[in-house]
Each structure stands twice: as structure tokens, then as C-alpha cells.
Regions:
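Post-HEXXH active-site segment of zinc metalloproteases
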Residues: 124, 128, 139-177, 215-222
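Long, low-complexity, intrinsically disordered N-terminal extensions of eukaryotic proteins, enriched
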Residues: 1-49, 56, 60-65, 161
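Pan-zinc metallopeptidase signature
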Residues: 1-29, 184-258
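Histidine-centered divalent metal-coordination motifs
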Residues: 132-136
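Auxiliary, metal-adjacent structural segments of Zn-dependent hydrolase domains
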Residues: 33-123
Length: 258
């Protein structure tokens, strides 16, 4: 559902995302819990798209995640573009590739706006970026128990000389950490940077795996499966999936036998 075409920007000039979000704040459509959304009317956004891009990803969020999140507005727009200031704008026409952004956000103390480019955005990539935003929000909530227990896993992996990571950012920060000679304290800046990247990347994978049947990339940079499983089991304990949702194959098999 969206506004009639004459109520959305007709100019080809990009509109700053902050202004776009403010202009259509009153037109947000409730989705579920603390989520709402707005879709630009110029888009061919069907009921199937509403299910794939909005309803299913939100429905798959664990209750323990939903209860911690602030109010979140999702904006689906034709294109997001950024200038030298890196501040995002909404564009009705395709920007040059070097100025295209797939996603952007606005955050304050009370609510968060998550905006996504629709045109050319594969639904699987959209899910990944959506859950990456959610994972970053969770990290910023500073859950002491989650951080402490995940940190302990990383220390255990480090002591065992475990190679690899989940995604690019955690791999990059792990390499930086490993280039340091000697032991690195768990409260040091470089370890905290790695802890954040690893938590966000692993949490993104965990949430995406609840929603969809995804394949984990294999290769020399990938965390060995038994260590990845331990991380997912920890996140499953901290943030159990909704009823009838599963992450690990054995959980689905166990449920089917009941």
C-alpha cells in the first residue's frame, strides 16, 4: 500500500532522506510491533513484494530482539543517492553507479528510519542489509550479557588459533587483531572493534538464517563450521527464534518428530 502518485515527489532532483522521512511520517503504515513502513507510489510494489520485503523479514525476528528495538520506520524508495557529504537523498531516477546507495538510516534516541533502494535490489540482498541494520542496532544497545558471552567465544577461538570469519568486516578486523604481537586485552580498542564486527556479522547471518534457507559461503576466509555452529547456538540461546522458526537443521528435524 502506498500514496497516490500525485502525493510523492515528482521532481527529478534528489530529496534529502531526512526531509523525505519527515514529509511522509504521517503516512507510515503499521506493519508489526514497533515497525511501520512507507513505499513510494511510483514503485510497482505488489502484495507479494510486501510479503517478501516487509512482512516475512519482520515476522522472523526473535521476540527477544523485537522487545529491545526502538520504533523503526522502513522506507522503500526508487533509489538512494549520496553526495560528497555522504548524506543520503531519495531519487526518483537512477543516479550514477558511484552515487547509488542500497540503504541508509536515520537514528535518534526515540526511533530509527531504515531506507532501502527498491529498483535492482535483489530480495536476498535486501534481507541481508535489513538484518545487518538490526544487528548493528542490537550491538548499540550494549547488552552486557550478550557482549560478555560472545566475547568469551572469540577469546576461546583466539586461544585455539581459529582461522577465518563470517563476513568481510569481521575478517578485516580479525586480521588487524592478529597482526598484533602478543596477547591483546579484551577491553582494548582493537579487540572491541573486532568484537563488534564479529557480533554484527554473526548476528546478521543468524537472523537471515531464521528467515530464509541460505547457503554459507565456503572458502579460506570462512570460519570453520564447528566454531560457526557454537556461535549460532549461543545466539539461539540468547535470542530464541519465534515459534515454528529454526536455524540449525537438527532443530527442524527434532520438531518434526514431536
Amino acid at each position: 500500500m502506498s500514496l497516490p502518485a500525485d502525493q510523492t515527489p515528482s521532481s527529478n532532483l534528489p530529496l534529502p532522506l531526512v526531509q523525505f522521512a519527515d514529509r511522509y511520517k504521517a503516512d507510515l503504515i503499521p506493519l508489526s510491533g514497533n515497525f511501520s513502513y512507507f513505499c513510494a507510489a511510483s514503485l510497482p510494489f505488489t502484495e507479494e513484494d510486501t510479503r517478501d520485503y516487509l512482512e516475512e523479514p519482520v515476522a522472523a525476528l526473535p521476540p527477544a530482539v523485537l522487545s529491545r528495538l526502538p520504533k523503526i520506520s522502513i522506507l522503500i524508495v526508487p533509489y538512494l543517492t549520496h553526495e560528497k557529504s555522504d548524506k543520503a537523498s531519495v531519487s526518483m531516477v537512477a543516479p550514477p553507479d558511484e552515487k547509488l546507495s542500497w540503504t541508509a538510516q536515520i537514528r535518534n534516541n526515540k526511533e530509527t528510519v531504515l531506507a532501502f533502494t527498491y529498483n535492482g535490489h535483489d530480495v536476498s540482498e535486501y534481507h541481508y542489509r535489513f538484518y545487518q541494520h538490526i544487528s548493528n542496532l542490537l550491538w548499540d544497545l550494549k547488552d552486557a550479557n550478550a557482549r560478555s558471552r560472545f566475547s568469551a567465544l572469540l577469546v576461546e577461538e583466539g586461544n585455539a588459533g581459529v582461522h577465518g570469519e563470517v563476513d568481510e568486516e569481521s575478517w578485516r578486523t580479525k586480521q588487524q587483531l592478529q597482526r598484533r604481537n602478543g596477547k591483546v586485552k579484551a577491553d582494548s580498542k582493537i579487540f572491541i572493534e573486532y568484537l563488534k564486527a564479529s557480533f554484527v556479522d554473526t548476528m546478521t547471518l543468524y537472523l537471515h538464517g531464521i528467515c530464509c534457507d541460505i547457503d554459507v559461503d565456503t572458502g579460506p576466509r570462512q570460519l570453520p563450521s564447528r566454531y560457526l555452529r557454537k556461535r549460532l547456538q549461543l545466539l539461539q540461546e540468547l535470542f530464541p527464534p519465534p515459534v515454528d522458526y529454526y536455524v540449525l537443521p537438527e532443530d527442524m528435524k527434532s520438531s518434526s518428530r514431536k
